[in-house]
Regions:
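Conserved beta-strand elements flanking the ATP-binding pocket of the protein kinase catalytic core
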Residues: 25, 36, 81-83
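Active-site Asp-x-Gly
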Residues: 216-243
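ATP-binding pocket architecture of kinase catalytic cores
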Residues: 43-141
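ATP phosphate-binding glycine-rich loop
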Residues: 33-39
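ATP-dependent phospho-/nucleotidyl transfer catalytic cores
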Residues: 18, 25-29, 48-59, 105-121, ...
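Active-site beta-strand-loop-beta-strand hairpin of nuclease catalytic cores
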Residues: 39-44, 221-222
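Juxta-kinase regulatory segment immediately upstream of eukaryotic protein kinase catalytic domains
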Residues: 1-25
Length: 243
């Protein structure tokens, strides 16, 4: 057993796993969190070190995930299942790192590219179901873990000085796109203004509606679960459809 495995086995021991751990290995191709597959003599699990540089508010991030997943489970919807620590918490701070464990969802696949129209259709249906099952959830309970994530006016204000500086000299190569963007500046506040005045309802938003954030059943091809819930926040469902 290598030292790194010894460390990982020690971290896994902080969680209420069923069965003795027999192996831990890197898993997936995500770029944000560091993910491992934990094998036991019983169920399998996903062990993750959360990226606190991108998500410094671990407490509220995990609170968001717990609120949404518990709501989905109460309606019989398959979703990520948080495995508590041995002390009953949803995550653990270990040697300066923020760690959590999910139950591994067996017999599923995910895709980085759409292999056929059926998968594309199922992906759209899956995110539609996600919105539908959470339509009665009070999204004001959720915390904004990444400030101004889909706040277009705020991003536009950031864009203007970056365009003026043009530090890498690339603006000329995309001038038609820039002109198009600038010509629609009067529309950028529509959604945010609607959220503020209540004309657009506040809803749970996933904010990262990529194909590979859906687990499909390996046999039927049907969507089983929406994953990568770290960007769940309050917002407009238009954010997710826009993505």
């Amino acid at each position: 057993m290598t030292e790194s495995n010894e460390v990982l086995f020690g971290i896994a021991s902080h969680f209420a796993l069923e069965g003795a751990v027999t192996g831990i290995e890197p898993y997936g191709d995500g770029h944000i969190n560091t993910t491992y597959l934990v094998t036991t003599d019983g169920p399998r699990y996903i062990l993750q070190q959360m990226n606190t540089s991108i998500f410094p508010d671990t407490v509220n991030l995990m609170r968001n995930v717990e609120l949404v997943t518990s709501t989905l489970k109460a309606q019989g919807k398959e979703t990520l299942d948080i495995v508590p620590t041995t002390s009953g918490a949803t995550w653990a701070e270990i040697d300066g790192g923020a760690w959590r464990v999910y139950k591994f969802i067996e017999h599923t696949v995910s895709y980085n590219l759409v292999p056929n129209p059926d998968v594309f259709r199922e992906a759209g249906s899956a995110f539609g179901d996600f919105q539908n099952f959470l339509s009665e959830f009070d999204a004001s309970q959720l915390t904004e873990t990444i400030a101004h994530f889909h706040d277009t006016p705020h991003r536009f204000e950031d864009f203007k000085p970056a365009l003026a500086a043009d530090k890498l000299g690339r603006a000329a190569a995309c001038q038609p796109e820039i002109d198009f963007y600038l010509s629609h500046a009067d529309q950028y506040a529509v959604v945010m203004d609607g959220l503020r005045d209540g004309s657009i309802p506040l809803r749970v938003t996933h904010n990262d509606t990529k194909l590979n954030n859906i687990l499909m059943d390996a046999t039927t091809g049907k969507a089983r679960a929406i994953i990568d819930l770290d960007t769940i926040m309050p917002g407009s469902m238009l954010f997710d459809f826009g993505d």
